[in-house]
């Protein structure tokens, strides 16, 4: 029996449309603000407002899923995101856009928690790695296609908002034709995010999500700046970023399958070691294409494997809370990593980007090497 059931395929189809909209807005909002001559610090504050919304949305969604179920939570999340999109057209200004980007951030985080939790509840410990790999592939493909759309269509604010909003609403349609059952309904016990973060046997997965946030946040946010400082043109920067993201897409399925077959611990160790090797290779300034490719293939696949590690340590009724904890950990890493790394790069050297990535990866590798035991019969099962 295929793990890609009808509900899973419809869920991923909706996610693809929503990810297209997310990618387009995340690219164009800073450009629209710059066009309105807002100072750089205000553009940064609007971006921070979006990520703050991500944190709030992550914390809220577990309660909504418990009360409304997966389908209605997904509809609500999409409508919140659509409202955050439409609101941008009401008034252009710093405070207005801070508010609407916060709303959009809440909606996006709700979408991610609902989709990830639904996939984890749909799978078992034996196939969850492949389900999460498919999720990440769809996410990165949607991001890539969103960037392609931006380069091919008019980027005027009032031209973009109608069709982006239509994409968001279209993302609701697939789930109207299926129902994703929440297996938490049998349990009335509420599981807190804090208890999941403190769960000793899942700590390596939580730490992995933090490290993944630091690595991906730094690569996404600071790699273009690094390449620019190396004298690479804007068009070539786009090419190298495409190499990085493409490697992440290509690596998802085989690494997810390997994690299901050989265990998360072994695969995580190899991934982290490869991230360190890729970072060192980038510091040598030779063979940038293979160095970026292996860095992308290993770095962009850390998150789903670390998630699968933690989720096999908890019972079925704790999966949603665990997913919230993992997404929260990733978000914190993606906020703190680029900020700290950017300060180091500004005051010392651009090479600190890869030194930082290699350093945090090495610390995580030591954690993984200390834990020689991997539970062969996980708690979570169907």
Curated annotation (Swiss-Prot):
Record-linked Pfam families: MFS_1
Topology of the protein relative to the lipid bilayer: Multi-pass membrane protein
Subcellular location: Cell inner membrane
Gene3D superfamilies per record: MFS general substrate transporter like domains
Gene: ycaD
PROSITE patterns, sorted: MFS
Annotated organism of origin: Escherichia fergusonii (strain ATCC 35469 / DSM 13698 / CCUG 18766 / IAM 14443 / JCM 21226 / LMG 7866 / NBRC 102419 / NCTC 12128 / CDC 0568-73)
InterPro entries named among the record's database cross-references: MFS, MFS_dom, MFS_trans_sf, MFS_YcaD, MFS_YcaD-like
UniProt keyword terms in alphabetical order: Cell inner membrane, Cell membrane, Membrane, Transmembrane, Transmembrane helix, Transport
Domain of life the protein comes from: Bacteria
Parts of the chain that traverse the membrane: 14-34, 45-65, 79-99, 102-122, 131-151, 157-177, 204-224, 236-256, 265-285, 289-309, 325-345, 349-369
Tagged with keyword Cell inner membrane: yes
A GO term, aspect molecular function: transmembrane transporter activity
Entry's Gene Ontology cellular component terms: plasma membrane
Main location: membrane
Protein family: Belongs to the major facilitator superfamily. YcaD (TC 2.A.1.26) family.
Protein's name in the database: Uncharacterized MFS-type transporter YcaD
The organism's taxonomic lineage, starting at the top: Bacteria, Pseudomonadati, Pseudomonadota, Gammaproteobacteria, Enterobacterales
This protein's record includes keyword Zinc: no
